[in-house]
Every structure is written in C-alpha cells, then in structure tokens.
C-alpha cells in the first residue's frame, strides 16, 4: 500500500516540477510581438502560428453561455399563472324576472314598452283568459240562486219553530244580483210549502178530532152497558135465588141469564171499539207529529245542502276572480322591461310563455361560467378571475376582473361538452372603456370567457412538464 502511495506522490510531484519550470520561462516561450505588416511577410506557416486568434468567436461563445445561464436562472425563479378557461355569460345576481301567463289567454292591452322602467306592482299587460268571463257570470248566477234557496229554507225553518209564516223580505242587499223572476219564484215556493205543511197538519188535526168524538160516543155506550150489565147481573142473582126457592121457573132464570150475556157482549164490543179508537188516536197524533218532523228534517237537509253549495260556489267565484286577477299581470319588482315579445292587441299567448323580462333596478351584474370537469378540482371560491367579453376585443376594450363567488356542488350535462360545473363570479365593475374613452355598459346575456387563476408554477416546470410526462409514460410497461 505504501508503494502505491509513494508512486502516486512521485507522479504528481514530477508534473508539479515540470509545470513550475515551464512557468518560469513562460515569457521566453511567447512569440515576439510583430506588427501587422511584419506578420504579412512571414512564411505562411509562421503567419498562421504567430497571428493571434480573433476574439469575436470567443466573445460570442461567452455571450451564448451567459444567455443560457440567465435563461435557466430566470426559468427557475420566474412564475407563470395557472389558468382554467371557462365559457359563460353575464347575468344579474337577483336573476331577471320572467313574466309568464298561467293559462292560455288573449292580449287585451299592453301598458309598457321595451326598455321602460316600471315600479313594483305596476300593471304590465291585461289579458283575458279564455272562458273566464263566462265562468264568472255563471258562478255569480248560481251563487245568487243559492242565496235565495238558503233564505227559502231558513224562512221555512223559522216558520216551523214559530208556527207562523214570517214576513218574506227579498229586497235585502244580498239579493240585489238576483232577478225579479227568481225572487218571486222563491217567495211562491216558500208560501206553497208552508201552506202544504199547514194543510197536512189541519187534515190530521181534523182526523184526530173526529176520532176523539167517536171515542166519546163509544165511551158513553161503554158506560151505558157497564150500568146495564151491573143491573142484569143483580137481576140474575135474584132470579137465581128465587129459582133455588122454587119460586121461579127455570125458563125465567135462563131468560134473565140471556139478557145478562147480551149486556156483557155489548159491553165487550164497545170496549173493543174504545181500545181501537184510542190506538187510532195515538196513531193520528204520531202522524201529526211526524208531519212536522219530516218536514223539518227535509228543510234542514235541504238547507245544509244549499249552504254547502253556496260555500262551494263562493270558492269557485274566488277562484275565477283569482284567474281574472292573474290575467292582470303586474311587475313583481321595480326594474327595466326587456325582451318584450307581445305587440298585438287580441293576440293569443300560451301557458308559461315568456312575455317579457324585468331586470331589477338594484341588481348587481355577475358572470356565470361553466367550469370543465378536468379543472373543477383546482377551482375554489375567492380565486381571481379575468373576464373577457366576446363582443368587445380585450386588446382594445380591456377586460373585467372579479372573484369566484360560488360553485355548484353538482355537475350539469351540456350537449357536446359533457359534465360541467356552474360557477358564479362577482365582477368589480359593469362597464368597459372604449379606445376613445367612452364608458360602455354591459348587459345580461353577453357571452364571456372566464380565465380563473388556480395557482402558479415556474417557467422551468412548465417547459419540462411535457418531457417529464413523456419520460414517465414511456417507462411504463403494458
């Protein structure tokens, strides 16, 4: 090992000594300085050897190396923005209010024009729903008739309770919409029904009185034959005692017994008739009560039906009035009328057709962008956004700036694009500046391109990423 180290030492020492000796005589080894004209008369091989090399190529090489070093340093230090590009449009934060009819209707009158400012509640369009006027008239007529019917049965109910017909007053305010013919008809029906009920009661009352008179007559016969039976009974006892004393013949005893039996039979017959009449009286009295009960029950049932019918008709009238009210379309908010689509009086509009759009006056202009699925993982609320309006070239009119306000949590399907996420962008201003210095106001619906700053990366990383990707993928095995 020592021999090896000694050999290496001697080797470097020899070169060191040689370099030192050459360094001492270095000036003697240089060629003498000659002028340019002296060098030109030297032989060619001496001219080539002694003429100094031009410094320009060396300087260019140094400059190239310096440029490469500076470029590498700048590429490593400098940062570029990572941008996700998303198409979209300008909108208002409160969402413009679309004005639509609730059903098919005819345009009766238009009160606004495109670009007009309207206040909340201001009438915009007057429509006539197909068949609404006829429905209202029909319902009002049915309701007036239902009120009369209710009054009819309420009056009859009062008459039943008081046993007398009250004054029929059909001139009250609630009946003002009823025709004179209907009022007279209801009055006649009330009087006719009350009279019929009274006649039925009178007939049953007379029948009851007749039965009562018959009862009194039969009762008198019963009393008569009860007395006759007692007398004949006493006679029979006396005849029987005389017969036992042999003071009376058997034929006379049998004759008296026959009279007693006849009196008893007559008494039984009249008592049976009396019981029958008492049952008849109970039946007649019950029928008399049932006449009133049935009549009252029928009146109450009809009154209940007509009260329910009136309630349903009131609801129907309210619904029809709401239909009429809905056909008078008013502004839901204060704002500006845009995209007015109806201009013809008498024209027909269909259900859910957009008639116009109201842009709220205090609305804030925003942008909505559709972020591609491949970029959504890097987009977050609060990130800076540059918005370029397609209508105005950004190189001449500039661009808008803003920040991500909200990102939808769920993707939506877009034709020819696939799944995208809707992002709302709050912008700093709602106008651009033209080359001549004029302010240009922007409006909802303008197409934009949003460039969302998702981060930064070095230029070197940007330049090497394709190479890195190629190398990484090329080293994979199938």
Swiss-Prot record:
It is a single-pass membrane protein. GO terms for biological process: killing of cells of another organism; protein secretion; transmembrane transport. Residues 1-59 are cytoplasmic. The keyword Transport applies. Residues 81-478 are periplasmic. The keyword Protease does not apply. Keywords: Cell inner membrane, Cell membrane, Cytolysis, Hemolysis, Membrane, Transmembrane, Transmembrane helix, Transport. GO terms for cellular component: plasma membrane. It is found in: Cell inner membrane. It holds the Pfam family HlyD_3. It comes from the Bacteria. The chain crosses the membrane at residues 60-80. Belongs to the membrane fusion protein (MFP) (TC 8.A.1) family. Involved in the transport of the Leukotoxin. This is Leukotoxin secretion protein D. It comes from Mannheimia haemolytica (Pasteurella haemolytica).
